[in-house]
Amino acid sequence: MFDLSDQLITMGLWSISIGAFGAAVAGILLANTDFFLSQTEKATLDYLEETELKTIGEEPRLFKAKDLWERDGAVIMAVRRPGCFLCREEASGLSTLKPQLDQLGVPLYAIVKENIGNEVEHFQPYFNGKVFLDAKGQFYGPQKRKMMLLGLVRLGVWQNFRRAWKGGFEGNLEGEGLILGGMFVIGSGKQGILLEHREKEFGDKANLTAVLDAARKISKQTAQNDN
């Protein structure tokens, strides 16, 4: 009878272990779908253009965000965290478009939500454009999205980590890095938002071909307006 009880207990423990393992595997698989990702609310031109931005430097000044794109349109990166090596990788890749954007007459900008120490200064070598402060985080809304522990079990995040590490990018942990960033291509005047990419997980970059294609639409619209 004693042996039978031991066997039943052992079988019960095995069943619990297998069940727990199965639940963990199912949880990881589910976490790698988009089911648990923060929902995205698209920004509108009216929402973005009244955003108050600040220059970063010795004599900071405030201005409305629409000044960035009103005449020539703009490509704008909303940086999750300047010290993040994934953000530095994305900024470096985006900067490769600078010669083509210059030919189109489209400026390249970056937005940060905080200015801590020398973080923006250390970010600047990776980004070939001006950087401005959005202290209220408007460019990260209207509905700010966060990624927390979920990021540690997503395969895509680890693949992004590996890609950036192999690329030789380094970073630090200074500042807030859970609110996800994004990318905008905004047309001149009231042309509107031509491309909006919202980072769905750490290191989820905008497609550079799509960014350049959207920027080319600004050039055509500007030419039509001049005529």
From Swiss-Prot:
Keywords: Antioxidant, Cytoplasm, Redox-active center. It comes from the Eukaryota. It is found in: Cytoplasm. The active site is at C84 (redox-active), C87 (redox-active). Transmembrane segments: none annotated. InterPro entries: PXL2A/B/C (IPR032801). Pfam families: AhpC-TSA_2. Belongs to the peroxiredoxin-like PRXL2 family. PRXL2A subfamily. PANTHER family: PEROXIREDOXIN-LIKE 2A (PTHR28630:SF31), PTHR28630. The active site cysteines correspond to the redox-active cysteines of peroxiredoxins. This is Peroxiredoxin-like 2A. The lineage of its organism: Eukaryota, Metazoa, Chordata, Craniata, Vertebrata.
